[in-house]
């Protein structure tokens, strides 16, 4: 990798140097009124719901309205006002984004997405749980394919979390919350300079949460420790170091089950709090990341940026779950009140190394102003040797010490209980009388499997030029992506697949008025299939990579003296080569490529202040995401799973600044999602609307807040796969918070 990087920069350096020489005669640009960062390494001091500038969509700082692609942002101020510290709560403020399930799993513009970035670099998601995000400055959602800059990403969009950076002023904020479901949360945010020259800055974010949740036997404990340092030896060089340690202790939630459901079965047939498991089940996850960034400004118009992120995820799992079948009696008849059970004991790790380096140059060619970016990035994902899975054998105990499916004709070979029924390997779960006590697992007959090591590597060279002329701005980007996937890495049975692609992006912005821009963009996407699908002979691969393309037009504007920002976007998005199960009764692992899926829609986002003391965040989406081509003719024309036609959200906050009510504030809002298809042909999730509100009181250095979520106590489901895996939203809950600022 280092050799490739060196060769690449030796090739492009003369061209950039030439461009820089030519730029010496260029007059100071429109940005001379403030010293712009070339990479995000310093903190944001704004305190609005509106975010004016972004790095995520272009890797250079640009005004959001100058980027020819929809970008939605949720700032820390909105997160704090809503007490939204998990991604599932945060994305309710973003058009076109909804939860696919109760996991770290979302739908963006109708397409499922698990790609998440941290400070513009790729992370590893544990999937099963959403971490506590007390260290996040803002969350940005880049709508549509972002592959031209980041390589293989999901077509619907990419979520980028930006960590809180050190500030050059001393500030200490302590927070404590208590609320429904025995929830307790404490937060600490410390920042300031470490020397008189303010060349060394620090920030430390701490968060701890303990909650029983509204689900039976599903308590969680979460801890986040996130220190950050910034070092600026000169006004041209800055180094930033971010460390994040995140720990989660809980249980793996498989969703609210309704076994034996038929078409029309009511989703409240079981309580939304109902779960299956044992008291000694656990899911322990640890995430550790280290991100170091360097930015150097050679001159006003020429800079270099490099950033590296090391991310590690560890899982330690023990769970009792159903094997999706009823127990049987001595006659082989099903007992619909007893579920067959199994256990999974798993240890696993995932590593990710992500590096990006690029030059940025400003220069002119005649009347054209260029903002050129040339870069290289490398990403390596690894599943190391040492992972293992121990799974209980499904079925009933035989007298010879093994486990098998019960056969009435061979009844004499099975161990029977006092009622003459076969004894299961793992005790059944009684649906009428649930038992969540501690289970004795030492007697289970299990099978152990070592996790196959895997490694995939992606690297790319990318070029981007933002060309300005008069009221026009043209964004041109091109990336060459190289992808290599190794299964059974470093073993004799190692298998390897390589794929590569050219990925273009072109967008145009027209400055209609000083405060309103209109834009259009065409962009392509690329996402290789996973190693397990490409080299496993049972699934029918290798398969072609996922490819996508998007056309988008829209308008962005700043209003009310730039206090309020709005975006309207219309898009057409296509994805090809989607993998789905072939439903082959002789080979349940076999997959097939569906063909094509298409999404069309319109999105509206509004964020900022209407008055100095009246803030608003609003979003609305109308879309249709359908399967357009499929090997199964009956699938063509169907809506995609968990892709609602309409969704939206609203949050309005009013703060009294004068008079006897000075310091008092109130907020109200909510969100809605219309009905959605699932993976089950007989289940459609109902739409829902949830109302929320909050009261605030601020005096001296203390701020008090009371948040009420789901005021009307509406039973609703945020996502789901089928009747056995439903994900209900929380019932009415209250949270009281106090902040003390020094």
Place the predicted regions along the sequence by residue:
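Structural signature of Gram-negative outer-membrane beta-barrels, strongest in the C-terminal barrel
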Residues: 232-234, 350, 369-373, 377-381, ...
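Acidic, small-polar-rich N-terminal luminal/periplasmic segments of exported/outer-membrane proteins
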Residues: 36-169, 553
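Acidic/polar loop-and-plug regions of large Gram-negative outer-membrane beta-barrel proteins
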Residues: 209, 213, 226-297, 312-350, ...
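Membrane-embedded beta-barrel scaffold of Gram-negative outer-membrane proteins
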Residues: 297-309, 313-319, 545-602, 606-609, ...
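Gram-negative outer-membrane beta-barrel transporters
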Residues: 471, 572-574, 593-680, 737-741
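Outer-membrane beta-barrel translocator/receptor signature
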Residues: 135-137, 148-225, 233-237, 288, ...
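Surface-exposed extracellular loop regions of Gram-negative outer-membrane beta-barrel proteins
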Residues: 189-216, 220-226, 287-362, 456-488, ...
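Conserved C-terminal beta-signal and adjacent last beta-strands/turns
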Residues: 344, 348, 360, 372, ...
């Amino acid at each position: 990798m280092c050799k490739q990087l060196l060769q690449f920069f030796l090739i492009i350096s003369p061209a950039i140097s030439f461009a820089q020489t030519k730029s010496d005669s260029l007059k100071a640009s429109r940005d001379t009124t403030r010293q712009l960062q070339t990479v995000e390494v310093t903190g944001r001091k704004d305190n609005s719901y509106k975010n004016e500038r972004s790095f995520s969509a272009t890797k250079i700082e640009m005004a959001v309205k100058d980027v020819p692609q929809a970008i939605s942002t949720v700032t820390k101020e909105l997160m704090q006002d809503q007490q939204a510290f998990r991604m599932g709560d945060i994305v309710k403020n973003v058009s076109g984004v909804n939860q696919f399930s109760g996991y770290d799993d979302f739908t963006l513009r109708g397409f499922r997405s698990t790609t998440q970035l941290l400070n513009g670099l790729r992370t590893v998601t544990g999937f099963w749980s959403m971490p506590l995000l007390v260290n996040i400055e803002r969350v940005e959602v880049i709508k549509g394919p972002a592959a031209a800059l980041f390589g293989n990403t999901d077509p619907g969009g990419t979520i980028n979390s930006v960590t809180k950076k050190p500030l050059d002023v001393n500030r200490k904020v302590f927070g404590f919350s208590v609320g429904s479901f025995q929830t307790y949360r404490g937060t600490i945010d410390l920042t300031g300079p470490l020397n008189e020259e303010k060349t060394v800055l620090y920030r430390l974010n701490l968060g701890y949460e303990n909650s029983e949740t509204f689900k039976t036997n599903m308590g969680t404990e979460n801890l986040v420790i996130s220190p950050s340092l910034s070092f600026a030896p000169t006004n041209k060089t800055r180094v930033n170091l971010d460390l994040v340690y995140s720990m989660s202790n809980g249980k793996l939630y498989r969703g609210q089950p309704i076994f034996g459901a038929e078409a029309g079965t009511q989703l409240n047939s079981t309580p939304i709090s109902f779960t299956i498991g044992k008291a000694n089940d656990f899911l322990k996850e640890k995430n550790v990341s280290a991100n170091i960034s360097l930015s150097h400004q050679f001159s006003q118009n020429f800079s270099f940026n490099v950033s590296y992120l090391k991310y590690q995820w560890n899982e330690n799992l023990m769970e009792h779950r159903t094997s999706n079948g009823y127990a049987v009696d001595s006659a082989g008849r099903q007992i619909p009140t007893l579920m067959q059970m199994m256990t999974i004991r798993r240890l696993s790790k995932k590593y990710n190394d992500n590096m990006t380096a690029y030059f940025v140059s400003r220069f002119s060619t005649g009347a054209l102003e260029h903002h050129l970016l040339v870069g290289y990035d490398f990403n390596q994902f690894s599943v190391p040797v040492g992972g293992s899975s121990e799974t209980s054998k499904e079925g009933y105990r035989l007298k010879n010490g093994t486990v098998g499916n019960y056969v009435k004709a061979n009844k004499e070979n099975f161990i029977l209980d006092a009622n003459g029924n076969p004894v299961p390997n793992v005790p059944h779960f009684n649906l009428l009388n649930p038992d969540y006590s501690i289970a004795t697992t030492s007697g289970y007959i299990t099978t152990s499997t070592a996790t196959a090591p895997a490694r995939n590597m992606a690297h790319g060279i990318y070029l981007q030029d933002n060309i300005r002329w008069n009221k026009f701005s043209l964004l041109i980007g091109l990336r060459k992506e190289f992808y290599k996937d190794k299964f059974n890495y470093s073993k004799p049975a190692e298998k390897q697949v390589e794929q590569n692609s050219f990925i273009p992006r072109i967008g145009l912005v027209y400055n209609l008025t000083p405060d309103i821009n209109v834009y259009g963009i065409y962009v392509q996407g690329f996402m290789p299939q996973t190693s397990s699908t490409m080299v496993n002979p049972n699934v029918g691969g290798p398969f072609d990579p996922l490819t996508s393309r998007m056309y988008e037009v829209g308008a962005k504007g700043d209003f009310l003296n730039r206090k309020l920002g709005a975006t309207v976007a219309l898009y057409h998005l296509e994805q090809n080569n989607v993998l789905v199960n072939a439903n082959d009764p002789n080979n349940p692992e076999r997959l097939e490529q569906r063909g094509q899926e298409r999404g069309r829609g319109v999105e509206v986002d509004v964020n900022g202040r209407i008055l100095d003391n009246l803030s608003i965040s609003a979003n609305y989406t109308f879309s249709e995401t359908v399967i357009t081509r499929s090997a199964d003719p009956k699938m063509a024309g169907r809506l995609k799973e968990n892709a609602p036609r309409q969704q939206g959200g609203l949050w309005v906050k009013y703060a009294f600044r004068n008079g006897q009510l000075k310091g008092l504030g109130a907020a109200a809002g909510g969100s809605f999602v219309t009905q959605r298809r699932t993976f089950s042909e007989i289940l459609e999730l109902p739409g829902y609307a949830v109302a929320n509100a909050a009261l605030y009181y601020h005096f001296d250095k203390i701020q008090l807040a009371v948040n009420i979520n789901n005021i009307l106590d509406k039973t609703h489901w945020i996502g789901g796969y089928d009747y056995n895996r439903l994900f209900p939203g929380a019932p009415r809950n209250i949270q009281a918070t106090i902040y003390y600022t020094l």
